[in-house]
A protein has these predicted regions:
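Acetyl-CoA-dependent GNAT
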Residues: 8, 17-92, 104-105, 174
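Short hydrophobic/aromatic beta-strand or adjacent loop that forms the aromatic wall/cage
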Residues: 48, 164-171
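Intrinsically disordered, low-complexity Ser/Thr- and acidic-rich flexible linkers and loops
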Residues: 72-76, 155-161
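Conserved acetyl-CoA-binding loop-helix of GNAT-fold acetyltransferases
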Residues: 90, 96-109, 133-137
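Conserved beta-strand-loop-alpha-helix junction that forms the acyl-donor binding cleft
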Residues: 121-132, 148-153, 161-162
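Conserved acetyl-CoA-binding loop of GNAT-fold acetyltransferases
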Residues: 135-145
């Protein structure tokens, strides 16, 4: 993947592969060392590409492109290999400036370079309707039924612990 520079008004940001020395920056976007470490390992093993958006070398967003087959969409792809976009995240103040779109385009470019003709993702349509609209605008369409993607523990601002059920739909795009 070739790093590229983009502009938001007068701010220049760079889309590029994340490197191990970016770990401290990533913690400003999402404070989960083990998640980032595992993703860097997957990238090192050739199973994924971890792509970030950076302003002045500070991470402002990222996405993990899993190159392993997204098995749950196989019935909808005529068994063509389908990569999986996971955990697209942009820091709140910089959302709606096109950074997410550029990360998606970078994933699509990498897939094409690797001969992968389908790209999939999961999105929670109830909790994240803006993301679903973005994916639709970029040519992704829903396949299958809504499903429980995971149950995640959280702690709210008052320190109360709870569990969140992430009900998602699969979306795919043929490249």
């Amino acid at each position: 993947m070739t790093a590229r520079l983009n502009k938001i008004d007068c701010i220049t940001y760079q889309i590029r592969e994340i490197e191990e020395n970016d770990l401290n920056n990533l913690l400003l976007v999402k404070n989960e060392v083990s998640v980032h470490t595992e993703r860097l390992k997957q990238q090192g093993d050739g199973h994924a590409v971890y792509i970030g958006a950076f302003i002045n070398n500070c991470a402002v967003g990222y996405v993990l492109l899993s190159l392993d087959n997204k098995e749950d969409v196989m019935p909808y792809t005529n068994n063509a290999k389908c990569a999986d976009m996971i955990d697209l995240l942009i820091i709140e103040p910089l959302r709606n400036y096109g950074i997410g779109s550029q990360l998606i385009l970078a994933c699509e470019e990498i897939c094409k370079e690797k001969g992968i003709l389908c790209l999939g993702l999961d999105v929670n349509p109830e909790d994240n309707p803006k993301a679903k609209r973005l994916y639709e605008k970029m040519g992704y369409h829903t396949v299958g039924e809504i499903h429980l993607d995971g149950v995640y523990e959280y702690t709210d601002e008052q320190g109360n612990k709870g569990k969140y059920e992430d009900w998602c739909i699969d979306m795919i795009k043929f490249l």
